[in-house]
Amino acid sequence: MPKVHLPNYGEFYEKRHFIPGMREPECIELAGQETLIGTNLLFACKQLPAFVLAAEVCEDLWSPIPPSCAHALAGATVVANLSASDETVGKAAYRRELVCGQSARLLCAYLYADAGHGESTTDMTFAGHNLIAENGSLLADAAPFAGEDAVTELDLGRMVQERQRNTTFMPETNGYTTVEFELPPVELALIRP
């Protein structure tokens, strides 16, 4: 999944090494296999129709119009953010607000997976601050520097229902490719009340 918004301020100098990723999916060969690359990809579970996954990368969430906005309008009920967000004073609280706000605005589950402390450098410290929010509520919060996973259940049926009820949530699927995948259901004990 390519990154769309490249930070080039403060401690970030990504534009000297990278260019923004393309939105329209293209087929490339990688490790001897053909695969799609691009930001406008949705991954739909055959067994759970309400589970439609999309992804964005780190800075994309912090931008004025994150790719996740288009992902949700295209049908994503779960957005994953693969991030290497460094730690500064007050950033963990701000990150929580961003993740919760985006999940509320998009009527989706938002999974935020941060680089861990073992990935820190001499220039930046990463805390492994992993978060899961659903429709504005923070469901799981792995404390920074604790080395924990964020784990919970998601009520995807509720997300679909909320979108159907909200008349200003207008789906727009142009330019998106959906890749179906299989995920056989497994019975688990619920951990969420």
Segments predicted by a language model, with ranges:
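Enzyme catalytic cores with a strong preference for nitrogen-chemistry domains
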Residues: 1-193
